[in-house]
């Protein structure tokens, strides 16, 4: 009898991707975050679909429809908070996934890495548009401030902003189009994830040592499916704890006030996962310079393969590079803290120093350090 798993055209693809996939035998828990992101995407699409059934993208009724979901729809409150806090889980896993990629030198798989960066940009765009939909104060003013940044682009900036708004300010047209894009983008992200995996399976997974492990591979199932299942359990436990005990912990109280174009909140700030980029944006007094720094803070990841000067792929056996990596992590945490603070002394100078250090570490210190470590290998 023929084995359907190995011979059926569709099952064969699943088999080669999830069951008989040759996987390095020494990959650690850091390799769990890819599958956790897949779980998060699934949760977000399902909860988002149910929310979209009850949400109305009209400036007059958007806020009320979200209230209606929480009060009147069966289990609407849990669906809404799973979706809102699910976004925080997505970014927690994303940052850890990227951090591990940098630490273990996975960016040398340039196709997989570049599609990952494209995915990051798309996830950030989707999340930003989703934050606008409840039409609270922070939704409205966040949309106004962030879209207004495009006006810094010379010559076409003002026209571009009005084109995105669909008028002369953030209004009904803006909300409707943001809802449309917020709905469609996760499906495009899901398709890109498939391409991300396609390129990954062309080369095979990296491992903590950074050394080619073709001589020592084990099947993905059952060894890593069980490991992923444990990760799923921990992630769902963490998400449900957050949703059931303190669902508004990561939100902004201002978003429980309906949007009012005549009343500006005292501190306009995005969700916690954008604060590091927001701090970099604010640290440069010039508007265009700030926007460029904001884009480059993410786009800089694309040149990481070209900045890799070490003879070793992973940082596992490179203590000086490890130190710089953890300084970079501390710097990003500092930027996240600064992004949530008001624009006043001493936060301005701390933000500027942290922003400078971020670029200096990635562009100068880490490549230089790798060259020094290469010299030390000969001693």
Swiss-Prot record:
The keyword Transport applies. It is found in: Mitochondrion inner membrane. Its cofactor is heme b. Keywords: Electron transport, Heme, Iron, Membrane, Metal-binding, Mitochondrion, Mitochondrion inner membrane, Respiratory chain, Transmembrane, Transmembrane helix, Transport, Ubiquinone. Its main location: mitochondrion. One of its GO terms (cellular component) is mitochondrial inner membrane. The chain crosses the membrane at residues 33-53, 77-98, 113-133, 178-198, 226-246, 288-308, 320-340, 347-367. Heme b b566 binds at residues 97, 196. The keyword Transferase does not apply. Heme b b562 binds at residues 83, 182. GO terms for biological process: mitochondrial electron transport, ubiquinol to cytochrome c. InterPro entries: Cyt_b/b6_C, Cyt_b/b6_C_sf, Cyt_b/b6_N, Cytb/b6-like_sf, Cytochrome_b, Cytochrome_b_C_euk/bac, Cytochrome_b_N_euk/bac, Di-haem_cyt_TM. A ubiquinone binds at residue 201. Binds 2 heme b groups non-covalently. It is a multi-pass membrane protein. GO terms for molecular function: metal ion binding; ubiquinol-cytochrome-c reductase activity. The cytochrome bc1 complex contains 11 subunits: 3 respiratory subunits (MT-CYB, CYC1 and UQCRFS1), 2 core proteins (UQCRC1 and UQCRC2) and 6 low-molecular weight proteins (UQCRH/QCR6, UQCRB/QCR7, UQCRQ/QCR8, UQCR10/QCR9, UQCR11/QCR10 and a cleavage product of UQCRFS1). This cytochrome bc1 complex then forms a dimer. Belongs to the cytochrome b family. PANTHER family: CYTOCHROME B (PTHR19271:SF16). Component of the ubiquinol-cytochrome c reductase complex (complex III or cytochrome b-c1 complex) that is part of the mitochondrial respiratory chain. The b-c1 complex mediates electron transfer from ubiquinol to cytochrome c. Contributes to the generation of a proton gradient across the mitochondrial membrane that is then used for ATP synthesis. Heme 1 (or BL or b562) is low-potential and absorbs at about 562 nm, and heme 2 (or BH or b566) is high-potential and absorbs at about 566 nm. This is Cytochrome b. It comes from Ochotona alpina.
